[in-house]
Amino acid sequence: MDDAELLGAAGAALAAELEDADDVPTRREQFVVPEGVAYLAGNSLGLQQHAVRAAVDDVLEAWSTLGVDAHEHGAFPWLPYHETMRETVAGLVGAKPGEAVVMNSLTVNLHTMLGSFYRPTPDRPRIVIEADVFPSDRYAVMGAARAHGLDPAEVVVVLRADDIARFLDLEGASVATVVLSAVDFRTGALLDIPAITEAAHRAGARIGWDLAHAAGNVPLRLHDWDVDFAVWCHYKYVNAGPGAVGGCFVHERHGNDASIVRPGGWWGHDPVSRFAMPFAFDPVPGAEGWQVSNPPILAMAPVRVSLDLFAEVGMEALRARSVRLTGFLDRLLDVVASRRKIEVITPRAPDRRGAQLSIVVDDARAVTDALFERFRVRADDRPPNVIRLAPAPLYNTYEDCWRAASALDMVQSSTW
């Protein structure tokens, strides 16, 4: 087949063949997919599982029929609700049970972790971030510097991702903490987490990872990679709904370290004595000791359902399907790029990226709008000129990829 034919009927037929042949079947039937839409924006907000509505309704029913007694009774009592996700959230990020917890939101968790793991000294005042970090992380890091009476302009080191490991080898003795994004939100590039983590530790620094675009997207081994801490959201690839409760990882070697400052809150207190309300804070061992307030159960229900599905399918299987889906889309975008004015800026090697492919076009917002209004293809865009397409392996299909590339070709040809 000539590559140019991939954008026509022959490509649609090939997409159907690839779907039938994939040994990791789609779970599309378990999701509410907007009618007629090729939805490739799961890197922004994942789709809703059908099971979510029932899970939320169960909480509402328990509240209406049991009231306060639902804390200890019902199918999923509220007091230990977060514990029902202890193993599934750990499995999502490659942690040991107890090293990961569902709580707060990503930036709140980042502030919490910086309060514990950014402890500057006169010799080690610096904190390293990457140049193209999502702004919320930059704001949190700058705030952490100010909280210690330091000038962010003097202690926050902003580097290109490719320069971080070398900088740590050369100047790491002045670095207290490193905070990086595992997957770049604009380009979709995946950093070498274990190598950079090792470089940070060689330098004597602690390192934390923002997994917003990595959790549920690529397999993670946070415990084995010796990561100090990590934070993430559950509303992108994990599909737990807008503003979903986030996640936090603390390596077990820090879990009982009394020298590490924790925020302190009653839900992080040992549950055996929590309701005795003692004067002194006695934290739960592990990441759960960083909890502050009791969990929002209505918001936790979609997270529980979503994590259960990931545990059922398995990240390795999902990653295998994801590599094939994104590879097919990549091949199609190459055809578009050969005849239209677009440029793929995501690394081409599968081990350097997740599901997302990012392309540069003129007037990205207008192109994104045209893709949806004319062809019912949902992508998203980020300034100044980037369109992001992310086939989510749980519910996207090869046909979705073909529709996206074919529509992009027509939009860029101005024949629509």
Regions from the PLM with identified roles:
Residues M1-W416:
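Pyridoxal 5′-phosphate
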